[in-house]
Amino acid sequence: MPQAIHISPIDNVVVALHPIAKGTLVEVDGLAVTALEDIPQGHKMAVKPIKNGENVIKYGFPIGHATADAEPGTWMHTHNVHTNLSGEVEYSYNPSPDLAPLPKVEPETFMGFRRKDGRAAIRNEIWIIPTVGCVNDIAKKMVADNQDLVTGTIEGLYTFTHPFGCSQTGHDHAQTRKLLAALVRHPNAAAVLVLSLGCENLTHEQFLEELGEYDHDRVKFLTCQDVDDEFTAARDILKELAAYAGQFKREPIPVSELVVGMKCGGSDGLSGITANPTIGRFSDMMGQRGGSTVLTEVPEMFGAEGFLMDRCIDRDVFVKAEQMINGFKEYFISHNEVVYDNPSPGNKQGGITTLEDKSCGCVQKGGTAPIMDVIGYGDPVVTKGLNMLYGPGNDLVSATAMTAAGAHLILFSTGRGTPFSAPAPTLKISTNTPLAEKKSGWIDFNTGVIADGEKTIDEAAKDLLDLVIRVASGEQTKAEKHGFREISIFKDGVVL
């Protein structure tokens, strides 16, 4: 079993694949270094002398600079490494010399649902979407009272509550409206009840304008203040929606019609070595099959955005990527926050030292394929291949944004563990085997086998594709079995 990994030949650190005790001789890639102190799993150890102020190189890229001289064998972490990041950057388009679509592969099929508008779906559910937080508990009771309607090919009745829809103005109000309308359009929802109170800022007329044309058999509306008994009214509407949703049956659909979101949270020092590269390889495989993948978490691209921007398929896509990156930095600065105020305490405990360190691991999920498009918050994926989406690093907010963009399911890598799920089925992918063994009720797929030397990244990615096809065909994720699913909406302004 390998002790450590030397990710790039030019790196001056290695990453411990397992805990390394002080005095242990570590041999990797022709290097032989004795650990001068204990090195926890996922943490970095110097393999060359590093002077005070000299860059610490990991992934072949500076992830910060040393704040003290370090001899080979030294533990390199927050106590002796600091970020190099600052504010906005003026980028230039330098497309990678090997920038080209990957060779095509005949797509496999999954057993999904074909909607009347031609779109594919992997779940056949009824959703209740509240337009305002005031009706959250009403929506929950409607779900509880009508579970008997979940029969035949109908796979669930769910609501996605939130605190917004009123006391918001301007951009926040528009984002809430746009996000909720996007959820109503999601193909995994066979039928939708849009539930409102009646006096909120987000009026029925505004929502209809945002939603645009819709199937009146698929989407129904209920305003609680307009009826004597909202529960009786909802029952009648939900019966109609159930009759509509029950018409759909699973049938073979090519994998090329899938949209898959890619996310990491509770990352550790192995995230960029096991789970995220596996997801990246999977993303490339999806692109080869004509499918679509979505990468977000813009603040966790800071410091590594150049890797992605050089892969933009053309200058127009590059300009959109540049605007997205610097726009998010402006958002931080406008709130008097530094752009590098990341990683989290859990990230640091797992071995991630700086935002560049975290970002270099994060962008591994993007694989090697060209970036075909950059899309805004609440906008749908319209281009096959790899897409970048405007959204924060926050797990719930970014996963909700990917669902709203049309992701049928989400791949979520984690080194620390998390139980949550978006409305779209969310597969948890562990970076290390101890986590998979400890939290077997949370984790769907273990890439710790790569660190254990049992499988290669290519082998793990093929296994992951097989799992995605099974989940798309109806196999439940761990979170689905527990009934976990929720949303969180991005906000930036005042609450009235």
Q: What residue spans do the PLM features occupy?
A:
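Metallocofactor- and cofactor-centric catalytic cores in central/energy metabolism, strongly enriched
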Residues: M1-L409, R416-L496
